[in-house]
Amino acid sequence: MLSFSDILLKLQEFWKNQGCLIVQPYDIPAGAGTFHPATLLRSLDSKPWNVAYVAPSRRPTDGRYGENPNRLGSYYQFQVLIKPSPDNIQELYLRSLEALGLDLKSHDVRFVEDNWESPTLGAWGLGWEVWLDGMEVTQFTYFQQVGGIPCRPVAVEITYGVERLAMYIQSVENIFDILWNDSSNSAPMLYADVHLQSEYEFSKYHFELADTQMIFSLFNQYTQEVKHCLQQKVPLVAYDYTMLASHFFNILDARKAISVAQRQNYILQIRELAKGCATLYKEMEEERTMRREKNKGL
């Protein structure tokens, strides 16, 4: 039986063998793997870009103090981005499931139309949910637009729900019962041993303890720093602060410190910041490309 760690390693190995660059998780909290600059910004590059990575994800509003067997405030995704999208991407994805030991002839695998949108990132795409015997385990998206900019050529994003895959592969009903490690050479560790206490503490913080006055102040400071960095033409730095602003907005949302009307205004603020980062990144990437082409002709 594959452990949680084994699943991540096998996915990395599979996609490495398909030509993907394996990069590391980003060091700023994010609600999904899409926020990683290796996806969000690199999907705008004019040249090919194939990448895969583990994406620790935080969604404060989804926390349940570690008491819900299927819902977490912090969890893992495995993210793949390939630009341009290959014609055989569905076949490659199915082969990745087989690499995890799944006999697809014995299971019902369905691609269910489910187009994707991220209001805070100004991004959307066409795609599907992938259901394995009735449970969603993956999201497929063909990016059409990121940061308000059309993706040319179109990139395909594959986002695996690692906990759901692990529950299925290990035949457990509770996330916290997932076997984390290969116990042949060490004591067995469960998902609960690694994450249950932090799930409780961060739920308590996000719902009860977070100092909203301080977080509002930090949000405003981060948004100002994004604008400063864009003026100084450092879009990668500006995007870091955009991610931080987004994370602190999510904490305020979990703390119920933002009204329904205010919530939309905050989302629009973050979207404009993300668009600014994407626009400047794309402009500078095109300038670098033109310089390279010019130098080749010398």
Swiss-Prot record:
Alphabetical list of InterPro entries matching this protein: aa-tRNA-synth_II/BPL/LPL (IPR045864), Gly-tRNA-synth_heterodimer (IPR006194), Gly-tRNA_ligase_asu (IPR002310)
Keyword line:
Aminoacyl-tRNA synthetase, ATP-binding, Cytoplasm, Ligase, Nucleotide-binding, Protein biosynthesis
User: Care to name a GO molecular-function term for this sequence?
Assistant: ATP binding
The reactions it catalyses are: tRNA(Gly) + glycine + ATP = glycyl-tRNA(Gly) + AMP + diphosphate
Q: Its Enzyme Commission number?
A: 6.1.1.14
- Gene3D superfamilies referenced in this protein's UniProt entry, alphabetically: Bira Bifunctional Protein, Domain 2 (3.30.930.10), Class II aaRS and biotin synthetases, domain 2 (1.20.58.180)
Quick one: a GO cellular component term? cytosol
Q: Where in or outside the cell? A: Cytoplasm
Against CDD domains, the record matches this protein to: GlyRS_alpha_core
| Keyword Ligase applies | yes
Q: Which GO terms describe its biological process?
A: glycyl-tRNA aminoacylation
Protein's UniProt keywords contain Cytoplasm: yes
Quaternary state and partners of this protein? Tetramer of two alpha and two beta subunits.
Which NCBIfam families does this chain map to? glyQ, PRK09348.1
Q: Which family does it belong to?
A: Belongs to the class-II aminoacyl-tRNA synthetase family.
Q: Tell me what this protein is called.
A: Glycine--tRNA ligase alpha subunit
Organism this protein belongs to:
Helicobacter hepaticus (strain ATCC 51449 / 3B1)
